[in-house]
Amino acid sequence: MSTHDPISDLITRIRNAQMRSKSKVSTPGSRMRASVLEVLKSEGYIRGYASVEHPSGRSELEIELKYFDGEPVIREIERVSRPGRRVYASVKNLPRVNNGLGISVLSTPKGIMADHDARDANVGGEVLFTVF
């Protein structure tokens, strides 16, 4: 199935799987989704992910979700910049999520990264979504 917004699709799949207490969820594979999942993994919001190749030639990303005491580690995940309304932030105006307890994931000229990494690299970009 073709989606117009692959990031929103990924976020929705993760949110729905965690509401149902699933241990794994799969999503169509792409480099952008893999970059987003790499950020979530490095920040400790998911256990990991793996790329699975199907005989038909398409690839899928299988995401291992993370729980703590039976509760999902991701309490809140929200899309900020959408295809109809893009949201950009300079390095000075990068949003802090819940006073620094969460992260914003950005698409920058240096790749997809968390807000604190963007501050360290002194780059701004498109604010894709926030995680808490």
Curated annotation (Swiss-Prot):
Keyword Protein biosynthesis in annotation: no
Q: Which GO terms describe its molecular function?
A: rRNA binding; structural constituent of ribosome
Methyltransferase recorded as keyword? no
Task: List keywords of the entry alphabetically.
Answer: Ribonucleoprotein, Ribosomal protein, RNA-binding, rRNA-binding
Query: What InterPro entries has UniProt attached to this entry?
Result: Ribosomal_uS8, Ribosomal_uS8_CS, Ribosomal_uS8_sf
BP terms from Gene Ontology: translation
Q: What SUPFAM superfamilies does the record tag this protein with?
A: Ribosomal protein S8
Q: Which Pfam families match?
A: Ribosomal_S8 (PF00410)
Q: Which family does it belong to?
A: Belongs to the universal ribosomal protein uS8 family.
Q: Which GO terms describe its cellular component?
A: ribonucleoprotein complex; ribosome
Coiled coil start-end? none
Instruction: Spell out the protein name for this chain.
Output: Small ribosomal subunit protein uS8
Subunit-level organization: Part of the 30S ribosomal subunit. Contacts proteins S5 and S12.
Gene name linked to the record: rpsH
List the source organism. Answer: Rhodopseudomonas palustris (strain HaA2)
What the protein does? One of the primary rRNA binding proteins, it binds directly to 16S rRNA central domain where it helps coordinate assembly of the platform of the 30S subunit.
